[in-house]
Amino acid sequence: MRFIQHKAEALWFYRVVSMGYDRWINPLFWTAPMRDAALELGALDDPGLEVLDVGAGTGFTTSGIVARVAPERVTMLDQSPHQLARAARKPALRAVRKLRGDAEALPFADEAFDRYVSAGSIEYWPDPQRAIAEAFRVLRPGGRAVVVGPLRRSHPLARALSDAWMLFPAEDEYVAWMQRAGFVEIERRHVAPPWWRPGWDAYGIAIAGRKLRSGPPALAAAPPREAASERLGPVRLGRFALGSLAGAAFIPVALWFTARERLRRWGRRR
């Protein structure tokens, strides 16, 4: 299934979503505290670091990066021109380099960056192992990669909807992809928005690894299987519609629990 786990379909998905991404999506599903907790794993402790943000979208994660690193040393990469156009309007990101590109075939030389960050992009990658191998390739020895993404659901309905939408990997899959690419010193932490309830499955993961050696990834990567430029015909258009509907089902859930949490806080203040 995973109707949006395809580059062309994801491109169309974000053509629509980009119009309200910062206003409606991030406040529900990818908040500033989540972002900051994830970026802590990246050791962005030197303003002179060269940082690549893959699947950067409208620049929400990039905004957290440039709070720690000089903007002119940061590169945003995304396949969606609509998302990047939104990012270009943000004053804090004016000096950031912005490129269209493919996470599975990064348009950079080997060992070009000190840090690699990708948040909320892996779920759209047809071949996550290839993309993480590319992260290893473009990092210099001693560099760190941070990948943030959703985790597999155990509830039957939530799992059916998420699997119809896009990729929700298991935690051990994230670890295996990092290790197979050659990353060591793996660190991970769970991240979740305020409305996510204790006792539920872990919402998402931030996982980081370090590249110790020079050279190619430990696991040779196959060529990309598809491109965002592939034609979106009737079958793919149907998949796009079904996947979008499955993803939209999560929005009222998030809104409901967000409202409950705010009412609870308001009641405590009275």
What are these regions (language model features)?
Residues 143-149:
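Conserved beta-strand signature within the Rossmann-like core of class I S-adenosyl-L-methionine
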Residues 150-166:
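Short, glycine-/aromatic-enriched active-site segment of Class I SAM-dependent methyltransferases
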Residues 1-44, 60-64, 83-86, 243-267:
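Conserved class I S-adenosyl-L-methionine
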Residues 167-182:
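Short alpha-helix
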Residues 194-233, 266-270:
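Core SAM-dependent methyltransferase catalytic element
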Residues 129-141:
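A short glycine-rich, Lys/Arg-flanked "PGG" loop and its adjoining helix->strand segment in the class I
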Residues 104-115:
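A short acidic, Gly/Pro-enriched loop at the edge of an enzyme's catalytic core
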Residues 50-105:
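Class I SAM-dependent methyltransferase SAM/SAH-binding core
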